[in-house]
UniProtKB/Swiss-Prot annotation:
One annotated GO biological process: 'de novo' AMP biosynthetic process
Pfam families named in the record: Adenylsucc_synt (PF00709)
Pathway: Purine metabolism; AMP biosynthesis via de novo pathway; AMP from IMP: step 1/2
Binding-site positions, GTP: 12-18, 40-42, 304, 330-332, 412-414
Enzyme's top EC category: ligase
GO cellular component: cytoplasm
Keyword line: Cytoplasm, GTP-binding, Ligase, Magnesium, Metal-binding, Nucleotide-binding, Purine biosynthesis
Protein name: Adenylosuccinate synthetase
NCBIfam families: PRK01117.1, purA
The EC number(s) this enzyme carries: 6.3.4.4
Gene name, Swiss-Prot/TrEMBL: purA
Record text on subunit structure and interactions: Homodimer.
GO MF terms held by the record: adenylosuccinate synthase activity; GTP binding; magnesium ion binding
Organism (species): Leifsonia xyli subsp. xyli (strain CTCB07)
Amino acid sequence: MPAIVIIGAQWGDEGKGKATDLLGSRIDYVVKFNGGNNAGHTVVVGDEKYALHLLPSGILTGGVTPVIANGVVVDLDVLFQELDGLIARGVDVSRLKISSNAHVITHYHRTIDKVTERFLGKRQIGTTGRGIGPTYADKINRVGIRIQDLFDENILRQKVEGALDQKNHLLVKVYNRRAIGLDEIVDDLLSYAERLRPMVVDSSLLLHQALEDGKYVLFEGGQATMLDVDHGTYPFVTSSSSTSGGAATGSGIGPNRIDRVIGIVKAYTTRVGSGPFPTELFDEWGEFLRERGFEFGTTTGRPRRTGWYDAPIARYTARVNGVTDFVLTKLDTLTGIERIPVCVAYDVDGVRHDEVPASQSDFHHAKPIYEEFPGWTEDISGARRFEDLPKNAQDYTHALERMSGARISAIGVGPARDEIVVRHDLVGEAPSPADASR
């Protein structure tokens, strides 16, 4: 059976949790393969709203096995806060599995993250300060702490001691902060071990066996393509691989097992933190999108930057990920706008660019070239078929589909889990290349 990857196709906060939830009743496993608790998603179930930061959204669907795979960095305090919060609300969390190879965020990672960002001043990246980047840096530098290390105190103590030799030198000599004690870190990590033990598995083997047994496996990407460490707007990116390729390396399955890649795009664009954003709005329309779309970070609560839909970005992310289907979210946010601008290309120093410039400098100087489309005033939250949408909303969707590099297979028309229009089956046979790129 297929492995399906869901990817954010802009700068994050596109509504991936809702798309995952849409597929949940037909999915057996939901896998988080990158990132940590630096990106949140909100899932609405009936009258209940759940804000998740680390746990896969599949944990809210009965019968689904949620998996935190090896590509994730895990803050154990956040993990158990989220689990305990769900347990208190009657959610069964006993199915959760965590890779023994996932890396652990410690107190010193969070400290380094925060003081480094302050030290950078105007050059700061805009991190969430949750220790994600420093944990991935330790992973690459081969001094990281993995989940499996918590079950051997001698190994854990040796690894933490080696890491603190460097971290404390940096904190004391460069940042003028106090040193962090070895026992403080080791005791904290060991306190989680026994509760964690029943959840820990070889996630690569688990997922391989699931696919061999004909199970449906959904890979849920954190952050988004334009924040990918290789393919995003570097250096204003996250520290992990947030494209479809990261699903294979971040979980231990072969790339040939991936059958479909579903890209999630808002009907407009948002971004959090620093970095280029060609369609960003600084006027009343930017505030309109922010207030109407509730564009405030699930993790940080900070206001998101807002702008119009960017078709070159969608084409770029379709190409980088091999997107077979797009899910267009928050179309309802645009209701009431008389003329809706869409960025169709960029002007860079008087030269038209139909695609995202490869040069970082060019992209920083890119000015959007807009085409406008007529809007609609009707409430679309009750639409369940494409034909139920106002003609102008249908035309807007068709226009985005033509410009974006893959078919739009579902459309979000409201915040609730059932407020969605499904045009094409997202679990059945994948579209042909001609259909996917039309």
